[in-house]
Amino acid sequence: MAKVYKHPISGFTYAVNEVGLVRVEDPATGRYGIFDDNGVWYEGEIRDVDFQILGWVGRTPEARALREANS
């Protein structure tokens, strides 16, 4: 199962999506952003994220396997 992390300060949730990228979502507003594990932004309204958490969530073996399967 993919890792999901809730940021203790911002409240944003970080989770790996179906193609191995990290979806960052603000549960309060529904805004989101899609990033790779290095912090490169792909889409969405959110552009300012915690790069350390992107790495923790996006560099798991599960996330890597999804990226390889979808590339």
Regions found by a protein language model. Give the residues of each.
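N-terminal glycine/threonine-rich, aromatic-flanked beta-hairpin/loop signature
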Residues: 22-42
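N-terminal acidic leader/helix
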Residues: 2-27
